From Swiss-Prot:
Oligomeric and partner information: Homodimer.
HAMAP family per record: Rib_5P_isom_A
Family, similarity comment: Belongs to the ribose 5-phosphate isomerase family.
Segments crossing the lipid bilayer: none
Name of the featured protein: Ribose-5-phosphate isomerase A
GO (cellular component) term, any one: cytosol
One record GO biological process: D-ribose metabolic process
E.C. code: 5.3.1.6
Catalytically driven reaction(s): aldehydo-D-ribose 5-phosphate = D-ribulose 5-phosphate
Molecular function GO labels: ribose-5-phosphate isomerase activity
Organism taxonomic ancestry: Bacteria, Bacillati, Bacillota, Bacilli, Bacillales
Keyword Ribonucleoprotein attributed: no
Pfam families per record: Rib_5-P_isom_A
SUPFAM superfamilies, per database record: D-ribose-5-phosphate isomerase (RpiA), lid domain (SSF75445), NagB/RpiA/CoA transferase-like (SSF100950)
Length: 232
């Protein structure tokens, strides 16, 4: 996504923020742009509290003097604002490219409303992945063998030539979904495996998605919502 588009989405997302809200703050490059904008909003006198989904987000929020709550301290979460990896016409979503899928999913499940930010490339007819699968390191051989027995392409996520390790101390396997017919069922199947903590298929779908079309920010509403979205 171009930096200008990220900035446009961040500015549009700020319009959804109200004084007194508790916000779920996602992880990733698109969300970083929003948190930068939120920092300016707080600096100008806005009052919110955030629940961060990663150590990276905690550090950024602290630098910008955005007040944070732990998950235990948050009585509720009003709105999650985060990025996505893929979304299909039924608003089924893949996330976890930034490596924070488990915490992002917990925060999303606790939130009253979800707003995702996405450029046009994130919209697909079918979810093709890769699907991030967060696993305990000890279970890696077992889970990899299970997936390869299904003729699926599996890649251990790396960072700087070493296995990527999540904030929770786990590994991530990225699974190609080209041969998977039913992603929801497949994600549930994976969750039943010993050693699998979570997958990047999000059962809780967003209420709205902000995207950029022809140089303008557009808000898309979940198919089950009555408001049809529109230009922001």
């Amino acid at each position: 996504m171009y930096e200008q588009e990220k900035k446009m989405l961040a500015e549009a997302a700020i319009k959804q923020v109200k004084n007194g809200m508790i916000l779920g703050l996602g992880t990733g490059s698109t969300t970083r742009s929003f948190i930068d904008a939120l920092g300016e909003w707080v600096k100008a006198g806005g009052e919110v509290q955030g629940v961060a989904t990663s150590n990276e987000t905690v550090e950024q929020a602290k630098r910008l003097n955005i007040p944070l709550l732990s998950l235990e301290e948050a009585t509720h979460i009003d709105l999650v604002i985060d990025g996505i990896d893929q979304i299909d016409p039924r608003f089924r979503v893949l996330k976890g490219g930034g490596g924070a899928l488990f915490r992002e999913k917990v925060v999303a499940l606790m939130s009253r409303e979800i707003l995702y930010l996405a450029d046009a490339s994130k919209f697909v007819h079918h979810l093709t992945g890769p699907l991030p699968v967060e696993i305990d390191a000890f279970a890696r051989p077992y889970v990899e063998r299970y997936l390869r027995d299904k003729q699926l392409d599996v890649t251990l996520r790396e960072h700087d030539g070493q296995p990527f390790v999540t904030d929770g101390g786990h590994l991530i396997l990225d699974v190609d979904l080209e041969r998977v017919q039913d992603v929801r069922h497949f994600a549930q199947e994976l969750k039943s495996l010993t050693g699998v903590l979570e997958t990047g298929y999000f059962e809780r779908q967003p209420d709205h998605v902000l995207t950029v079309e022809q140089g303008k920010v557009r808000q898309l509403a979940h198919p089950n919502l009555r408001d049809g979205g529109g230009l922001v």
